[in-house]
């Protein structure tokens, strides 16, 4: 009985231990969506440059990610690779990279650093175009395996708070202010 209790105690200590993970940028998936005129959507992906996370008892404790904004890409079916609309796709990507929007030449990365976690919501500092605001990652799911972790969640932010806007007010009005991100990360123990 004493041996069984010692094993149970050891397992409880392991389960309660904090584990640090390095996020693998090659397997990370960060998708984005923006809505125009309330009906037309643009969506795509952006690559992760690096990331780290600390998990304790299956709960995210801390973490940060750096996003490579120069990798922003569109997955709109209207701009498929074999489509004749490649010029339109290039125009969209050029506009997203421009100073009006993400200004990737000046700000090649964006970051998110967790400041607190409550339940399945992580609050943190999002920095885009050199501007930092508090944002929330919701629907957070953390799954630990043998030396691995999987983290998913959603983040919606107001692009206006980061200066992501057309210079023309009339054009800017056709685009919803909310940009939605879906994040799927995996990492290995450090």
Where are the regions a protein language model picked out?
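Low-complexity, acidic/polar, glycine-enriched regions of mature
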Residues: 1-190
């Amino acid at each position: 009985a004493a041996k069984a209790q010692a094993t149970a105690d050891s397992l409880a200590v392991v389960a309660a231990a904090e584990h640090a993970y390095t996020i693998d940028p090659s397997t990370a998936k960060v998708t984005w969506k923006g809505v125009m005129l309330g009906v037309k959507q643009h969506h795509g992906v952006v690559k992760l440059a690096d990331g780290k996370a600390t998990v304790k008892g299956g709960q995210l404790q801390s973490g940060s990610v750096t996003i490579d904004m120069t990798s922003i890409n569109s997955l709109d079916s209207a701009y498929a690779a074999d489509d004749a609309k490649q010029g339109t796709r290039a125009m969209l990507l050029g506009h997203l990279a421009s100073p009006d929007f993400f200004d990737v030449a000046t700000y090649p990365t964006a970051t998110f650093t967790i400041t607190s976690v409550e339940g399945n919501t992580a609050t943190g500092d999002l920095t885009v175009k050199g501007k930092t605001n508090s944002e929330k990652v919701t629907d957070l799911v953390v799954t630990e395996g043998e030396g691995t972790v999987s983290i998913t969640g959603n983040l919606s932010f107001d692009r206006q708070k980061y200066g992501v806007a057309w210079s023309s007010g009339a054009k800017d009005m056709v685009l919803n202010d909310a940009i939605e991100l879906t994040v799927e990360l995996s990492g290995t123990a450090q």
